[in-house]
Curated annotation (Swiss-Prot):
GO biological process, one term: xylan catabolic process
Gene Ontology CC, one term: chloroplast
Main localisation: secreted
InterPro entries, sorted: BXL, Fn3-like, Glyco_hydro_3_C, Glyco_hydro_3_C_sf, Glyco_hydro_3_N, Glyco_hydro_3_N_sf, Glycoside_hydrolase_SF, Ig-like_fold
Entry keyword annotation includes Acetylation: no
GO MF, one annotated term: xylan 1,4-beta-xylosidase activity
Keywords from the UniProt entry: Extracellular matrix, Glycoprotein, Glycosidase, Hydrolase, Secreted, Signal
EC id: 3.2.1.-
Name of the featured protein: Probable beta-D-xylosidase 7
Superkingdom field: Eukaryota
Lineage: Eukaryota, Viridiplantae, Streptophyta, Embryophyta, Tracheophyta
Glycan attachment points: N100, N643
Catalytic residues (UniProt): D292
């Protein structure tokens, strides 16, 4: 009996812990909270935040300027953790989330670079919706000390060697900005079209990072902590800044993270032009700005930009930064104040932004579980619907790079034996990429393939992904006896990750030798599956007829193994398209520190927009088991007249107007619509992304103008033989403009060409 009572008591204690409400302020059962204006939900958020800040002592104020903000018991304000991560699912990284209670896992979606390959912005939105909902579910379970998530990463994947390129949506600024908007709206609880569903209340807070021109971590001894990105005004305006502008203006993100690196000599977190004049002034940002972790300390310690710790504090607070990931502001703000390098007003400004976001999250409105989003149960985390979306995301992102003689899909009836070879075939962790959380469940590619061919034989092939040692003879012996061979190779987080950039684009170690040897020995052409984030030079495989099919699977998340096997055996028709250019190994001769996008003498440029060199695979490349055709049907206006009285002529004798001169009203009407007919001419139904590009008649001539630029993309599901019409809206200011050498966006007169696949349509712009 005593044991039974003890068990009941333990169950009660556990249940009590799990049922405890998450940390919050302004408990209505506390009579003192009625005296505080910051607890009154009928008052404007700004007024509530000002009231709270006014009640703090200077020491309390300073304590709140770091990511791990302590509680203020006398006011009933609990501790708060600003740092949580949710790049492609609620993650381990950051101290804000714990998976040690009711919730022990979260849906782990594909790494962003693969999700982007679907070119489906509504799917991106749905993924972020799920992440936001699961984040709130974890918080409601009492397993989170904050609801601010430092995602998405919307830096441009400028160089294929970048270890964090896997975290981004790719190399195109327009696409990256579109991803940012979809992610922010989904996570924060808005609708897909941007309507706020619950006034000013946030489901969770998104933070677009890393502001700005951050795309080098650690390359040949040069680190992000000291790197000074020399960026032209044109590249800043046309490539690096647009995703952040879109994130703020259209996504209405509640957070921004300033980067480690300097841009043209100035640390990002200490740049008032960047943080205050641009983000808050020009783009009307209303949220908080955090530093990357220890990005304040390096301004003095590593970069030597500031002459003292107090100067570093002054630099960032006066620039417009609000919270420091790290302890630097907690240690040095008091002395900076005493030395009159900062004022209490500078501190108050930061705190108003910080507490405003916490109020918007509902953390000063009483028990959050009784408020909007309070009904999101921990049981919704890892729900069947969420896991199904993770599988869909992997299916839709995977790219079929090569499929000679229609080797794929395999017939489920005719494959009697299968050899599965490679270091990435049976490792769960590799599927997840970085910034991942504990997945709901996982199936490796090997296990998924064995659901189709029970007696599939497996050999790792290499001692690890680094493949310094390869068991080539054993792998060859297995391949010789199999009906078909699938090689699952690529990279993992030992080869590309945060704080680690690659120095070449080849597959690691003896992987190429293993692949070639197995392909030569196999009875039939083999299938090569690449699990990796960044591009690799697989020219040897692309040009080898004994390697019949190549699949790029990114880091496909918890359901990636299933998605890969479904594509190989024809239960899903692949439709993903590359969101980055795949360069040859010779690209490593270009200095990674060279930030120029445009080509120049002896320099081929970067990304599909400006690159003039050889490619392994182009941006947007992706095959299917079906064939699709495109035909332009209608264009609302083939000649557009802007009638700009202030038109000018440039050195190329091309008339142009400034986009700023046209203004919002002018740009709103300078649009046209175009309809494209898409037909599935194959035998399988499929989901197909349609990409529309535009180019100026003089595009790419002198390096000033892009070769072409993406102006729209949509995804459509078509049955075999089915046709459908898709409408695209082309905004001249947004889609056809370019930056001049002064970083000013201009719209040039002349003939433009809209292209979808091999179809092309002229559009004439008259300034």
């Amino acid at each position: 009996m005593a044991k039974q009572l003890l068990l009941l008591l333990l169950l009660f204690i556990v249940h009590g812990v799990e049922s405890a409400p998450p940390p919050h302020s302004c408990d209505p059962s506390n009579p003192t909270t009625k005296l505080y204006q910051f607890c009154r939900t009928d008052l404007p958020i700004g007024k509530r935040a000002r009231d709270l800040v006014s009640r703090l002592t200077i020491d309390e104020k300073i304590s709140q300027l770091v990511n791990t903000a302590p509680g203020i018991p006398r006011l009933g304000v609990p501790a708060y953790e600003w740092w949580s991560e949710a790049l492609h699912g609620v993650a381990y990284a950051g101290p804000g989330i714990r998976f040690n209670g009711t919730v022990k896992a979260a849906t782990s979606f594909p790494q962003v670079i693969l999700t982007a390959a679907s070119f489906d912005s509504y799917e991106w939105f749905r993924i972020a919706q799920v992440i936001g909902k699961e984040a709130r579910g974890v918080y409601n379970a009492g397993q989170a000390n904050g609801m601010t998530f430092w995602a998405p990463n919307i830096n441009i994947f400028r160089d294929p060697r970048w270890g964090r390129g896997q975290e981004t949506p790719g190399e195109d600024p327009m696409m990256t900005g579109t991803y940012a908007v979809a992610y922010v709206r989904g996570l924060q609880g808005d609708s897909f079209d941007g309507r706020k569903t619950l006034s000013n209340h946030l489901q969770a807070s998104a933070c677009c990072k890393h502001f700005t021109a951050y795309d080098l971590d650690r390359w040949k001894g040069i680190t992000r902590y000291v790197f000074n990105a020399q960026v032209s005004l044109a590249d800043l305006a046309e490539t690096y800044q647009p995703p952040f502008k879109k994130c703020i203006e259209e996504g209405r993100a509640s957070g921004i993270m300033c980067a480690y690196n300097r841009v043209n000599g100035i640390p990002s977190c200490a740049d008032p032009n960047l943080l205050t004049r641009t983000a808050r002034g020009q783009w009307a940002f209303r949220g908080y700005i955090t530093s990357d972790c220890d990005a304040v300390s390096i301004i003095y310690d590593a970069q030597g930009y500031a002459k003292s710790p107090e100067d570093a504090v002054a630099d960032v607070l006066k620039a417009g930064m609000d919270v420091n990931c790290g302890s630097y502001l907690q240690k040095h703000t008091k002395s900076a104040l005493q030395q009159k390098k900062v004022s209490e007003t500078d501190i108050d400004r930061a705190l108003l932004n910080l507490f405003s976001v916490r109020i918007r999250l509902g953390l000063f409105n009483g028990d959050p579980t009784k408020l909007p989003y309070g009904n999101i149960s921990p049981n919704e985390v890892c729900s069947p619907a969420h896991q199904a979306l993770a599988l869909d995301a992997a299916r839709n992102g995977i790219v079929l790079l090569k499929n000679n003689l229609k080797l794929l899909p395999f017939s489920k009836r005719s494959v009697s034996s299968l050899a599965v070879i490679g270091p990435n075939a049976h490792v769960v962790k590799t599927l997840l990429g970085n910034y991942a959380g504990p997945p709901c469940k996982t199936v490796t590619p090997l296990d998924a393939l064995r659901s189709y061919v029970k007696n599939a034989v497996y050999h790792q092939g290499c001692d690890s992904v680094a493949c310094s040692n390869a068991a080539i003879d054993q792998a060859v012996a297995i391949a010789k006896n199999a009906d078909h061979v699938v090689l699952i190779m690529g990279l993992d987080q030992t080869q590309e990750k945060e704080d680690f950039d690659r120095v070449d684009l080849s597959l690691p170690g003896k992987q190429q030798e293993l692949i070639t040897s197995v392909a030569n020995a196999a009875k039939k052409p083999v299938v090569l599956v690449l699990i990796c984030g960044g591009p690799v030079d697989i020219s040897f495989a692309a040009n080898n007829n004994k390697i019949g099919s190549i699949i790029w699977a990114g880091y496909p998340g918890e359901a990636g193994g299933i998605a890969i096997s479904e594509i190989i055996f024809g239960d899903h028709n692949p439709g993903g398209r590359l969101p980055v250019t795949w360069y040859p190994q010779s690209f490593v001769n270009i200095q990674m520190t060279d930030m120029r996008m445009r080509s120049a003498t002896g320099y081929p440029g970067r990304t599909y927009k400006f690159y003039k060199g050889p490619k392994v695979y182009e941006f947007g490349h992706g095959l299917s088991y079906s064939a699709y055709s495109y035909r332009f049907k209608t264009l609302a206006e083939t000649n557009l007249y802007l009638n700009q009285s202030k038109a000018q002529t440039n050195s190329d004798s091309v008339r142009y107007t400034l986009v700023s001169e046209m203004g919002k009203e002018g740009c709103d009407v300078a649009k046209t619509k175009v309809t494209v007919e898409v037909e599935n001419q194959g035998e399988m139904a499929g989901k197909h992304p349609v990409l529309m590009f535009a180019r100026h008649e003089r595009g790419g001539e002198d390096g000033k103008r892009a070769e072409k630029q993406l102006v729209g993309f949509k995804s459509i599901v078509l049955s075999n033989g089915e046709k459908a019409e898709m409408e695209f809206e082309i905004g001249l200011c947004e889609h056809l403009s370019r930056a001049n050498e002064f970083g000013v966006m201009v719209l040039e007169e002349g003939k433009y060409f809209l292209t979808v696949g091999d179809s092309e349509l002229p559009l004439i712009v008259n300034v």
